[in-house]
Amino acid sequence: MKGKKPSIEIATSNPSLPEDLVVSCLARVSRLYYPTLSLVSKSFRSLIASPDLYKTRSLLGRTESCLYLCLRYSPEDNPRWFTLCRKPNRRTLSKEKNESSGNLLVPIPIINSPPLEWSSIVAVGSHLYAINGPIEDAPCSNVSFLDCRSHTWLEAPSMRVAHTNSQLDGKMYLAGSSENVDSLNCIQVFSTKTQTWKPVPFQKRIFGVGDLEGKIYTICRTECGQGVTIKPKDLTCDVVGFCGEKDWSSVCMIGNIVYFYRPNGEFLWIYSGKGESARRNLKGLEGLPKFDDYASVKLVDYGGKLMVLWDTYVPESESKEKMIWCAEISLQKKCNNEEIWGTVEWFDAVLTVPEDCKFVRAIAATV
């Protein structure tokens, strides 16, 4: 009688990969998939929020724009934040009718989220800086920032002078409201690297050419629709006409070009230079649906592309809901830069919200 063959035990355990290898792999994945990957395990959630991951992404040249949408749900005091997420089974481009693009806005847990007291929010790298608005009609100098890597709100140093408006160009430039507005001393500069504020120096406000670059655009929300550009290099100002536009909620700047949407359905762009400005229609946009007259429309600089968000009410909805839609549009200059054409890469309904939910801000950070 033959003896039984000895049983062979097969190891089924799956040893963990070294953490640095996992980080290297995750750094090569688009951040659009991170909200889904964070659901895999607690360790994945920890890695996706780790500074090492984003350092690796930067070293590998894998940083990308990340869309954030801030909404206000009545009667809540604190806003809710959402980010664009892509389903893992998303196809390259949805060309079939009624086929979803696979893009969604998903809620993100925000730690220490402040109430909606800020009047402006600007993106500098992976941080979103919220500049507090007036409290009981008094200018406020408080500044908070959202770290888009860990989704945590932190406090930045307070401004030396309370502000009225803000723009940025690598650094943030804020027009103060507590000093002589005719003096350039009311302009403050915030270095996001050193986390310090400084005014434009007093003696004719002369400073190093290497410290400040480009232009600062400040829009005056008046019927004349005028704005001012400040050139830190030359210490000169130009008045820019914006053709009498009053609604600046649907506007963004990409490079040196201002894009805006008008309620009549037009997308326009303005190039400003040498004291002159020209307004032209954004051409192309084939396939982009017509927005409702009542729609709230937001434009975002999405890494050089134009991201458009708008809302539509859900017909015959018993729960009184509305849909938020999103479109990604690539831009191309033609005819010696006299024309700009937009190509709709995708558009889709990305979120369902109560109909009394309000747009607060749409913005993109680089992570």
Swiss-Prot record:
Superkingdom per UniProt: Eukaryota
UniProt keywords, alphabetically: Kelch repeat, Repeat
Every F-box domain range: 11-57
Signal peptide (residue range): none
Sequence intervals crossing the membrane: none
Keyword Repeat: yes
Ranges for the Kelch repeats: 127-171, 172-216
Protein name listed in UniProt: Putative F-box/kelch-repeat protein At4g39600
Annotated source species: Arabidopsis thaliana (Mouse-ear cress)
